[in-house]
């Protein structure tokens, strides 16, 4: 048996896009190009179905596995029309699995879903008997994690078994054949420095959608020296998190530790004047700022920049045993993005930084982060 693997990935610190191209067969593999006619495609993040062309890379009758929390009603709502139409018109065998839910139930956690999806792959690909594949995966898990104790091994075994058992085949509706093409979700910048806005709209949006090869040479005429403007990651708004933090002001002690530990500056404290608080978007929660009666305090979250790591909620001391941050479903929390967008445009409050000192955790977090959305 011969095999060839190529892994295409971006430079993001967390939650980046990785595309794994795998070929195998009984003859030597001499292909020097990426796979564009696959027998099997799996999407491990449900937000990607609107951002990238994936099912279009399948041969007729191929298999598509989507990791998502949706039932049939959810699929109708979230799958873009071009995906529905391709699945229906090309006889694609469509399966779904809720890897995040399985990860939580088996103790692996919401982000460690690779083992679960790998088990589902072996069930659907029918390369080797399912029972044999599960046994081999279990043996590999024991060899890899045996030193960490039997508890870790058992969690991996449970995830492997659940991954194979909880795959659900989707009965594709006839109506999907006529679904309208909705296009890919691409970033469009309007506000900000002209050089950054032009770069995002001309190049970055296409490249981020894995459509960079379609750009003409003329698109790069302003960047012939290889330079690119800084600060453009703020426009990406990837929306890759499954769960994001939601702030409960009643339990907040305004320590700013959550902002301090966030690697992506996706959760920020903000000081608002009475006028700024009055003009804030409807529903934005504010509270009196401790030690500065002229200001209101708010903790704002950029759901579309958050990676869902949960570090902020973990470090939050809360009040009387109740945390001020809870990780909740991204879809339900996305409406709070407007609070973040409003807050980050407010002028800096130098007197607030002076009051709490820039060399303290609390004071430093009122300053502009210099590393964001990475």
Predicted regions: what is each one?
Residues 1, 108-120, 254, 259-260, ...:
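Conserved phosphate/anionic-ligand binding catalytic regions in large, soluble enzymes, centered on
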């Amino acid at each position: 048996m011969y095999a060839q693997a190529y892994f295409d990935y971006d430079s993001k610190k967390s939650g980046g896009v990785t595309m794994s191209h795998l070929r195998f067969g009984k003859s030597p593999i001499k292909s020097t190009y990426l796979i564009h006619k696959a027998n099997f495609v799996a999407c491990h993040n449900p937000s990607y179905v609107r951002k990238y062309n994936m099912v279009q890379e399948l041969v007729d009758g191929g298999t598509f596995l989507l990791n998502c929390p949706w039932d049939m009603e959810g699929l109708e709502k979230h799958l873009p029309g071009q995906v529905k139409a391709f699945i229906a018109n090309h006889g694609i065998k469509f399966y779904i699995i809720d890897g995040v839910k399985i990860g939580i139930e088996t103790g692996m956690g919401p982000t460690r879903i690779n083992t679960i999806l790998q088990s589902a792959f072996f069930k659907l690909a029918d390369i080797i008997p399912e029972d044999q594949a599960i046994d081999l995966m279990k043996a590999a898990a024991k060899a890899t994690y045996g030193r960490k104790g039997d508890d870790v091994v058992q969690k991996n075994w449970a995830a492997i078994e659940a991954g194979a058992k909880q795959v659900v085949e989707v009965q594709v509706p006839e109506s999907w054949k006529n679904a309208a093409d909705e296009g890919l979700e691409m970033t469009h910048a309007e506000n900000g420095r002209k050089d950054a806005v032009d770069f995002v709209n001309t190049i970055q949006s296409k490249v981020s959608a894995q459509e960079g090869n379609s750009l003409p040479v003329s698109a790069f005429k302003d960047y012939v020296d290889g330079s690119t403007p800084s600060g453009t990651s703020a426009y990406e708004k990837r929306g890759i998190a499954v769960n994001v933090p939601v702030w409960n002001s009643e339990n907040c002690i305004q320590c700013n530790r959550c902002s301090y530990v966030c690697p992506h500056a996706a959760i920020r404290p903000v000081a608002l004047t009475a006028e700024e608080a009055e003009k804030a978007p409807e529903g934005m929660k504010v509270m009196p700022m401790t030690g500065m009666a002229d200001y209101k305090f708010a903790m704002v979250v950029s759901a579309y920049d958050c990676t869902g790591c949960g570090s902020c909620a973990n470090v939050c001391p809360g009040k009387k045993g109740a945390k001020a941050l809870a990780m909740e479903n991204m879809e339900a929390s996305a409406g709070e993005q407007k609070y973040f967008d409003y807050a980050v445009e407010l002028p800096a409050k130098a007197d607030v930084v002076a009051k709490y000192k820039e060399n303290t955790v609390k004071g430093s977090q009122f300053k502009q982060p210099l590393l964001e959305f990475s």
